[in-house]
Amino acid sequence: MLDVNFFDELRIGLASAEDIRNWSYGEVKKPETINYRTLKPEKDGLFCEKIFGPTRDWECYCGKYKRVRFKGIICERCGVEVTRAKVRRERMGHIELAAPVTHIWYFKGVPSRLGYLLDLAPKDLEKIIYFAAYVIVGVDEELRHNELSTLEAEMQVEKKSVADQRDADLEARAQKLEADIAELEAEGAKSDVRRKVKDGGEREMRQLRDRAQRELDRLDEIWTTFTKLSVKQLIVDELLYRELVDRYGEYFTGAMGAESIQKLMENFDIDAEAENLRETIRSGKGQKKLRALKRLKVVAAFQTNQNSPMGMVLNAVPVIPPELRPMVQLDGGRFATSDLNDLYRRVINRNNRLKRLIDLGAPEIIVNNEKRMLQESVDALFDNGRRGRPVTGPGNRPLKSLSDLLKGKQGRFRQNLLGKRVDYSGRSVIVVGPQLKLHQCGLPKLMALELFKPFVMKRLVDLNHAQNIKSAKRMVERQRAQVWDVLEEVIAEHPVLLNRAPTLHRLGIQAFEPQLVEGKAIQLHPLVCEAFNADFDGDQMAVHLPLSAEAQAEARILMLSSNNILSPASGRPLAMPRLDMVTGLYHLTRLDEGAIGELAASTSDEAEQGVYSSPAEAQMAVDRGALVVQAKIKVRLTQQRPPRDIESELFPEGWNYGDGWTAETTLGRVLFNELLPADYPFVNEQMPKKRQATIINDLAERYPMIVVAQTVDKLKDAGFYWATRSGVTVSISDVLVPPEKAQIMESFEAQADQIEKKYQRGALNKTERNSALVKIWSEATDEVGKAMEAHFPDDNPIPMIVKSGAAGNMTQVRSLAGMKGLVTNPKGEFIPRPIKSSFKEGLTVLEYFINTHGARKGLADTALRTADSGYLTRRLVDVSQDVIVREVDCGTERGIVTTIAEKQADGTLIRDAHVETSTYARTLAADAVDENGNVIVERGHDLGDPAIDALLEAGITQVKVRSVLTCTTGTGVCATCYGRSMATGKLVDIGEAVGIVAAQSIGEPGTQLTMRTFHQGGVAGDDITGGLPRVQELFEARVPKGKAPIADVSGRVQLEDGDRFYKITIVPDDGGEEVVYDKLSKRQRLRVFKHDDGTERLLADGDHVEVGQQLMEGAADPHEVLRVMGPRQVQIHLVNEVQEVYRSQGVSIHDKHIEVIVRQMLRRVTIIDSGATEFLPGSLTERADFEAANRRVVAEGGEPAAGRPVLMGITKASLATDSWLSAASFQETTRVLTDAAINCRSDKLIGLKENVIIGKLIPAGTGINRYRNIQVQPTEEARAAAYAVPSYDDQYYSPDGFGQNTGAAVPLDDYGFSNDYR
């Protein structure tokens, strides 16, 4: 067998009949499968042991040879080789066909490759192949030319004889008629009898004339057909062909069926044809040129590689190994078999019948019919249903052919090669484990015992609890007491992987150290729920066990949950306190006025109250009941760093641990600060979720991951502890309906009645009435909401939960306690009748049904969205899977300019809202210099929060940063252009699969995006596509719905306003030709933008526009942007447009992820003129190849090729990849494979997918070459310690048959018995 680690590329091509016979171990001659009595394979049948190998290890068919010692002997009685049964998975057979057949992929695919090669229309090809027409295969032009005059003379003679015969017959008939009439006249017959006889005679004469004329026409047709007879000409008329063969058989040869195609190909001169086509392309125009280009692609493919076009017509059909199309006995004695066996059986039956007919010398028509049936049966075997009705099995189910085995989600590629089921795994329901550390999980004892069984058994033997593995296994199965102690020992520090489906991003699988727990549920740390998107309402998770040392190391270092605190999408922590923990911390840091023991100034009779010398003293007061943790106190702190302002005032040299200072705060906040690292400045404020998130962000930016993990763990414990003590509960009595509600409703009811009256009178139309009512009731809802918020007391748990940011928002509270307000119908429009009740008061029946209307749409939407979003992720992964960090720095000077702040009129800077996702975590491409020329941050520096703050302080508004879009690395990207990895906060490692991370980061929030198209301000009209459909539209580079024109040039606008359309003319500044945009629908509205004077208003007549500026509302067409503004601008445009959608949903994704995808969309160039290069005009080429070829040609002094960048959608870009394995496993499998085989494509195995498919280590992460070839050199001491045992190259291990003398045991049956000792 091949070892995948030893080859670097995989080529696919056409197999010739020779190849097929060489692969084969024998010919399958009979359609039989197995003998139903003995259940043994039939000889020469589809399961024959002689051809495919024995069904039992080391045992021949007749049983003469049994045992391993006869290895390799071929039994003289039954002809079966004695070997392992698994060869039945790899040995192929073949069927020798009695007549050639064409391969359906090459004839029926679009475009038809056979048709392009032979220049025949697919319709004509079909007629030839399926015996409906003859085709001329060869014409002896010379012979025909030499003897043409003789043949013409013969033809003239024949024609003359026909004409003479006709004239003679007519003469005779006319005389007979005259005689008849004369006779009748003599008898005195009536005139009508005479007329009848005359008519009869004339009719016969006319028939004679017609018959002769038909004969002459036929001779003419035969003659003209013969004189113009050319190769590849079709003759559909059977009789005409027969005549031609009879008369001029020696001048030409014709045939039908696949044989004729084979003959045409034998005489086909590829080089000459390619030359002609190139000539046509150079001189031709229009359709002719296009057709020639398409044909040249196919012809050139056969010209350049060692493929022969003969491979498209088969003389032999390979039979795949029987284990891959098995036959299994069911318990009823019946057999279940793979569909392929039925399809092969049909081929063999028809082939055998055809052989017999040919031997018998059957008439041609019968033989042809049998050949046609053979062709159809081979077609069904290769691709059932591609042509005509599919062959069906029992129950009218179409049989699965070889192509169907590869296609689709259930096909070989996606089901078995790209994802497999694994052993050492289990799954169970998850429950919360609040006592766990961040890197731990609770594993049920029984599950752990089953997963670690082999480890436990080995350890039991090592510790002499069991004599051998068998008894150890028995101990484990009976769960003896010793087993549990051993299990504890075995699982220590052996991480396990937990996975929750759907795994939408890489944090869906994380490693944990298992802790044994009772029960049968897995315990999960509460802080990792966010990453897994898990909750404890019955979710299940799968556990996997990393076995090898390498796997354990990767799990521990790369996948441990405490090393995966940051989100790979935004670089912000995901392991945040949430829900109860937030409430607890919020409660802890609250400051209550007038609480027990609060700070009070000294009076004449009382000393100062609420002043403590240390947190411990304050804690004692709490224990005594003299103080509550929310009360304001003064306390002296020595172990916590003061806030920055106090530190600069009290400790100008900087604070040192142990320096005392007094804080006016609450004990709760002191306790909170004790959870943070000691040198973190004291935080003296209340802690809602947002504030907690900021602190954890800050920690992640400034402290090592270990500290962050410990801190969030402490926060979790404190959060739960104080949440329990806060007594936050929700009961119906906490839902307080504001008493002002009735009065608010009255005033708005009155307004609504007025609108209704106006409508009744006809003063308003329906749309106006609706929008007026919507406006009134929205205001009413807001009013009620405000009244409700004001009415809730501070200590009410419901607003407390919302204000702390733990869960919910005020809109939901408003539905509970105020009023539900307006709801939408499934179209997304507001229903003008509001829901006036709150849920506490209860809805009326009508309100209930109006409310469920929108809710039901929401659920249907979510279901559709999940599927759509999953498919988007799949396409994104496919297009970006080979983007891997390949080098540290590509050395480019280029970059993109990003804005970090906006300068206001008064000179102040306002930080840009999107710094987090655009500039943050990148590398500077040029020194950031302030107005005085001082370098604030140097080129090559990483922009974290501190660096960005420094830039803002220096008054810098824009910086030039490195970007994936400008990276010059050949395949993949370089680390410097990518910047820091969002998930680790450090510069990205070499080998990181950033393409997949990007795809996951964009795809994962896909389910949160909306499906619907928004109606703008209640105006019916062109909807603006938003949400997920908009993201798909952008990534697929489709022309958007409601496309907006962009200015082709800079210049002044002339705006003409028609009834239904605008007409915009741009007069260019450079005096070029005017650009006119006609028929712009008024429903689209003009675009608002900033003008030179700084005001924002609609585009108007006489305005000045810049090149690329959008003129109307709507979305610009990315292809237009590419044409007008060039590739860099279109990339930035796409990134911004995708970000628009995600930001509108509040999803934070870093630009670099979208850039990775967009870069893949613009990787190709369309060749316009090939110059002196090998490229075909009109073909798509990788930009890198294009530039390399041009450099080479220019260096040799030739003409470089001209090309223009082309924007491809992600589906198209995935299918256009250089790797045929990756493309075939993505979509349109048969089309990709057909194309790859003709072009003899070679897959360089650069991306991840192709390596996963062939089972090689993927070239990313630790599998990248520069890490794989590392050699560990032990130091002298290590060597001395390790090699105290005898070395392996002394006389103990003589290298005889054991391969490399590694001293490893060799399985007995692999040991060559060459030096036999019997």
Curated annotation (Swiss-Prot):
GO terms for cellular component: DNA-directed RNA polymerase complex. Zn(2+) 1 binds at residues 60, 62, 75, 78. GO terms for biological process: DNA-templated transcription. SUPFAM superfamilies: beta and beta-prime subunits of DNA dependent RNA-polymerase (SSF64484). GO terms for molecular function: DNA binding; DNA-directed RNA polymerase activity; magnesium ion binding; zinc ion binding. Its EC number is 2.7.7.6. It comes from the Bacteria. Its cofactor is Mg(2+); Zn(2+). Binds 1 Mg(2+) ion per subunit. Binds 2 Zn(2+) ions per subunit. It is an enzyme of class 2 (transferase). Zn(2+) 2 binds at residues 890, 967, 974, 977. Mg(2+) binds at residues 535, 537, 539. It catalyses: RNA(n) + a ribonucleoside 5'-triphosphate = RNA(n+1) + diphosphate. SMART domains: RPOLA_N (SM00663). CDD domains: RNAP_beta'_C (cd02655), RNAP_beta'_N (cd01609). Keywords: DNA-directed RNA polymerase, Magnesium, Metal-binding, Nucleotidyltransferase, Transcription, Transferase, Zinc. NCBIfam families: PRK14906.1 (NF011498), rpoC_TIGR (TIGR02386). Belongs to the RNA polymerase beta' chain family. DNA-dependent RNA polymerase catalyzes the transcription of DNA into RNA using the four ribonucleoside triphosphates as substrates. HAMAP family: RNApol_bact_RpoC. The RNAP catalytic core consists of 2 alpha, 1 beta, 1 beta' and 1 omega subunit. When a sigma factor is associated with the core the holoenzyme is formed, which can initiate transcription. This is DNA-directed RNA polymerase subunit beta'. The gene is rpoC.
